[in-house]
């Protein structure tokens, strides 16, 4: 998924992504056949995992059933490091979410393509995923997370836990998590049991670290 993100995703006002094909079961089956046990993707030099905890997410529901899922960020710690004079407000450095040039990683190690190149009046590709899931036309799940490039997988696992595995939110939030973003070819994990770690370690490099926080 992160490989396709790198190639196809960007501001849809500027680039026509093949969404229907990317979410089709036929394409998913085709991609799944390319996954080979024990095969590690080549990792280019200069790709680092640097994450801060500055992104903020909140989920709110009121007594009338109105809901809000909001994620906002400066991007990296202290954003651009510039404060708007007389305001105390830090300016972000969201320009890093654009692709400097195809194949060049941003501060989170994410690779971009022409679809996400810098252009005037264009929005950069973001990992922020504030989510509201509806069931029978009513809000069923309100969620989101912080964590830079890990947000996508954190929110996905929250949705899968509650919808596919019928977990309560409190149970889902305490569950172990994993994160893999194509490049670097490293699986980040939080809270996996030893037997699973031993099994996964046979096929890839694992790093234990904190992965996002959902609300």
Regions inferred by a protein language model and the residue ranges of each:
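Extended hydrophobic
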Residues: 62, 133-134, 140
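Structural signal for hydrophobic packing residues in well-ordered secondary-structure cores
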Residues: 2-9, 35, 39, 95, ...
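Active-site rim segments in enzyme catalytic domains, especially the processed small/beta chain
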Residues: 67-135, 165, 169
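Extended C-terminal subregions enriched in glycine
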Residues: 122, 164-213
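Short Gly/Pro-enriched turn/cap motifs at secondary-structure boundaries
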Residues: 47-51, 116-124, 208-212
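Hydrophobic, well-ordered secondary-structure elements that form the walls
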Residues: 1, 65, 132, 155, ...
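Internal maturation/activation junctions in enzymes
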Residues: 2-74, 86-87, 94, 102-103, ...
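Alpha-helical support elements that line or immediately flank enzyme active sites
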Residues: 145-167
């Amino acid at each position: 998924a992160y490989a396709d993100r790198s190639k196809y995703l960007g501001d849809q006002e500027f680039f026509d992504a093949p969404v229907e094909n990317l979410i089709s079961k036929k394409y998913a089956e085709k991609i799944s056949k390319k996954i080979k046990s024990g095969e590690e993707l080549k990792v280019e030099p200069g790709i680092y995992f640097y994450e801060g905890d500055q992104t903020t997410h909140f989920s709110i529901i009121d007594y009338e059933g109105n809901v809000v899922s909001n994620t906002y960020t400066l991007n990296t710690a202290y954003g651009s490091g510039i404060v708007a004079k007389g305001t105390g407000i830090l300016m972000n450095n969201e320009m890093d979410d654009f692709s400097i040039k195809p194949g060049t990683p941003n501060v989170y190690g994410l690779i971009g393509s022409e679809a996400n190149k810098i252009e005037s009046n264009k929005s950069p590709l973001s990992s922020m995923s504030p989510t509201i899931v509806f069931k029978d036309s009513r809000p069923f799940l309100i969620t989101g997370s912080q964590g830079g490039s890990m947000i996508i997988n954190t929110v996905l696992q929250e949705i899968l836990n509650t919808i596919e595995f019928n977990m309560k939110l409190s149970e889902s939030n305490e569950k172990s998590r994993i994160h893999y973003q194509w490049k670097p070819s490293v699986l980040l994990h939080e809270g996996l049991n030893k037997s699973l770690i031993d099994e996964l370690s046979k096929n890839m490099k694992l790093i234990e670290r904190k992965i996002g926080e959902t609300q």
